[in-house]
């Protein structure tokens, strides 16, 4: 079974949120078998900055769904969207 790299856009619920703390909470929320291979930050608007973690997950049924759900449950996250997916 191969692996998939997915860039996921995580929007915080406030421009005042501490992005370093949010990044740490996202790392701790990962389901088993998934790992983060780096973060990018994207200035959206009005001081709001999105986090863009690249997540490596096994290439099986469900794909990034478990990661999206776990990120969505993290305190301070407004929305989660997959931006890009590719096999590695």
UniProtKB/Swiss-Prot annotation:
GO molecular function, one term: translation elongation factor activity
Keywords carried by this UniProt record: Elongation factor, Protein biosynthesis
Domain of life of the organism encoding this protein: Archaea
Keyword Protein biosynthesis: yes
SMART domains: EF1_GNE
Coiled-coil annotated spans: none
Pfam families linked: EF1_GNE
SUPFAM superfamilies reported in the protein's UniProt record: eEF-1beta-like (SSF54984)
HAMAP family for this protein: EF1_beta
Official protein name in the record: Elongation factor 1-beta
Organism of origin: Haloquadratum walsbyi (strain DSM 16790 / HBSQ001)
Gene designation per UniProt: ef1b
């Amino acid at each position: 079974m191969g692996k998939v790299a997915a860039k996921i856009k995580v929007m915080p619920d406030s421009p005042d949120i501490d992005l370093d703390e949010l990044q740490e909470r996202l790392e701790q929320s990962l389901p088993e078998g998934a790992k983060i291979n780096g973060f990018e930050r994207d200035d959206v608007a009005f001081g709001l900055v999105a986090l863009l973690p690249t997540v490596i997950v096994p290439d099986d049924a469900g794909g990034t769904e478990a990661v999206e759900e776990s990120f969505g449950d993290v305190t301070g996250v407004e929305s989660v969207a997959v931006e890009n997916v590719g096999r590695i």
